[in-house]
Amino acid sequence: MTLRLFDTESRTMREFAPLVPGRASVYLCGATVQGEPHIGHVRSGVAFDVLRRWLQAHDYDVWFIRNVTDIDDKILNKAAEAGRPWWEWAATYERAFDRAYRLLGVQPPSAEPRATGHITQMVELMRRLIERGHAYASAGNVYFDVQSYPEYGALSGHKLDDVHQGESAGEGKRDPRDFTLWKAAKPGEPSWPSPWGPGRPGWHLECSAMAEFYLGAEFDIHCGGMDLVFPHHENEIAQSKAAGDGFARYWLHNGWVTMGGEKMSKSLGNVLSVPNMLTKVRAVELRFYLGSAHYRSMLEYSDKALDDAVAGYQRIEAFLHRTAERVGEIPVGKWTDAFAEAMDDDLAVPRALAEVFRLVTEGNKALEAGAVDTARELGGQVRAMLGILGVCPFDPQWDHKQDDSVAQTALDVLVRAELDRRQQARADKDWATADAVRDRLHAAGIDVTDTPNGPEWSLRTARGKAN
């Protein structure tokens, strides 16, 4: 069966046919690094890591780009409120996201570009748009002329008359529906030079420029959360295609993590941070939970749903460990046809997991009957399927010191809370409190080092330091 994916733009299931045979190019909208990652943030990372693994299983050479938005109004505002440099704030939470992805077993991207590292490409894209009559400069700002692009709204289904960009009218806008490509410099804010005056890029411009730079004018798959369909992805399409690029050929969007039927969001105060979740369950169990629903479905969080997922994973894990105790090493086998059919059907993970549990049931029966060869074969198949989902307990990511990993994560949460108090005290010039926090951590065996990217901590041992 050929891999089929649901394409948001055409609203149909389409067979995946890459632009270049044997190669798959994928762009995932990454984090705006404004704060601690919560499980709603990282669901897309887990979901599209499964896509990447399945493409690799189809023998594609996958070039996977996940960007970092490290300049944004929210970053500037939160850094200013905390009295910290914007770049330090962004770097701190970029590391927090990297740590969360790493703990959840998400494969590192082929490249992870920062927006601030690609201003040159953004300026060039704006120049092309202005030359083609699709953008205009006004009072140091640059705007995209939405009416100049008749196909606007094709991705989201929005009619032009109904468009609201969710941004201010803007100085010099010809039409309130036009969106910002370049924001003129303001006192106290970072800026970069451009032919239209100093300023900084708009969010939509960043992704178009980075996707083209790393993947080319046309590439295979663009991924992201469903909340990005409009305006972000709609605007990406408009500016890239208006500039003459083919841009993405398939659009994939994952559903939200919800609580009480509402999207998990810091503005609603209903977030569950990744570090705090990892004090309750192991990282592999959290990944299993986040990846257990179909990627396009909403994932309604509840303690019971999490507990059920953990119990399900532990059932699989127990079968594999019992089998290994009886037969020794379990070689990785080949997934079943039913598993492959499910994954080829728009990554139907719930059906794929049903096949995993079917084999676990058969395997447990084989163990009870003393049919160890059958159990070994079934265990190998289960290992292969869990490997695609990124949760095989025997994989190096998970097969060492899981309890130590949970304890380390819990300690990191507590220490970073203290470091945040210290940073706030320093911003307030409350040196006594800042020193007291540092001394308290030192007495507990924790050394703090101030770096250009913010404070780092290490645990002191009898022989020295160990991160």
Swiss-Prot record:
List of residues binding Zn(2+): C29, C207, H232, E236
Cofactor-binding details, from the entry: Binds 1 zinc ion per subunit.
Segments carrying motif 'HIGH' region: 31-41
Record flagged with keyword Repeat: no
UniProt keyword terms in alphabetical order: Aminoacyl-tRNA synthetase, ATP-binding, Cytoplasm, Ligase, Metal-binding, Nucleotide-binding, Protein biosynthesis, Zinc
Coiled-coil parts of chain: none
Main location class: cytoplasm
One Pfam family of this chain: CysS_C
Location in or out of the cell: Cytoplasm
NCBIfam families tied to this protein: cysS
Protein name, entry field: Cysteine--tRNA ligase
Organism encoding this protein: Nocardia farcinica (strain IFM 10152)
